[in-house]
């Protein structure tokens, strides 16, 4: 039994949901999202919210049950509140600035890195060393944050690079004489 899958997804006020077969579409104050549920689960829109249940007792159906419920919950939270991921930039001369639809990053390379900001994503650089990525699609926000972090991941000796806010970087000791 999926403990996550058993709970129905509550729909807050200001959010409308529609279930058409396996396609779930959710509309709210921040926008509209849709998700195609796998064939292993059934999705029903009821009074208590959106309920997900497995079609049969196979291992795959049970796995898809909890995953589908989480995906539907992410749709509802995304269109009502949105998602945000913060990055911290550490290092001498390392900085970020938003110019138009691009994020300009100085990360210690011989050239500045230009990262295009996709549609549906908002990037704010309040300080040169802090970047906030926000949007309604949790997967896309996490993917963009991961791509920016991958440009210069934190190194273990001095901790220079791009890291998630609150991320612990395992530090190593330098060479001994």
Swiss-Prot record:
Keywords per UniProt: Ribonucleoprotein, Ribosomal protein, RNA-binding, rRNA-binding
RNA-binding listed as a keyword: yes
Protein task: This protein binds to the 23S rRNA, and is important in its secondary structure. It is located near the subunit interface in the base of the L7/L12 stalk, and near the tRNA binding site of the peptidyltransferase center.
Species of the source: Methylocella silvestris (strain DSM 15510 / CIP 108128 / LMG 27833 / NCIMB 13906 / BL2)
GO cellular component terms, A-Z: cytosolic large ribosomal subunit
Signal peptide, first to last residue: none
Database matches in Pfam families: Ribosomal_L6 (PF00347)
Family: Belongs to the universal ribosomal protein uL6 family.
Matching InterPro entries: Ribosomal_uL6-like, Ribosomal_uL6-like_a/b-dom_sf, Ribosomal_uL6_a/b-dom, Ribosomal_uL6_bac-type, Ribosomal_uL6_CS
GO molecular function, one term: rRNA binding
Subunit-structure text: Part of the 50S ribosomal subunit.
GO terms classed as biological process: cytoplasmic translation
Stated name of the protein: Large ribosomal subunit protein uL6
